[in-house]
Amino acid sequence: MARWNVCSYCGKEFEPGTGKMYVRNDGRVYFFCSRKCEKYFFMGRNPRKLKWTKAFEEAKLQRAKRK
C-alpha cells in the first residue's frame, strides 16, 4: 500500500497520485495538495496566519496554553 502524502503548506494528508511534488535544486521535496497551497507557498504567505491550515490550529493552541 502506498504512503499518504502530507501537504507541505497546510498539513493536510492526501492520496498518492493526487497533488503535486516540487523538488528544489538542493534536494528538498515539497508536496502540495492543491494549487491554492502551492500558490500561497511560492507567494511567501505565512501558513500560521491562515485559519484553514493546520499550522494555524497548532499556533492557536499554543497561544491558549500561554494565557
Swiss-Prot record:
GO biological-process terms attached to the record: translation
Cofactor(s), names only, from the UniProt record: Zn(2+)
Keywords assigned: Metal-binding, Ribonucleoprotein, Ribosomal protein, RNA-binding, rRNA-binding, Zinc, Zinc-finger
RNA-binding recorded as keyword: yes
Keyword Transmembrane on entry: no
Binding site for Zn(2+): C7, C10, C33, C37
Protein family (similarity comment): Belongs to the eukaryotic ribosomal protein eL24 family.
Function: Binds to the 23S rRNA.
Name of the protein: Large ribosomal subunit protein eL24
Organism: Thermococcus sibiricus (strain DSM 12597 / MM 739)
Source lineage: Archaea, Methanobacteriati, Methanobacteriota, Thermococci, Thermococcales
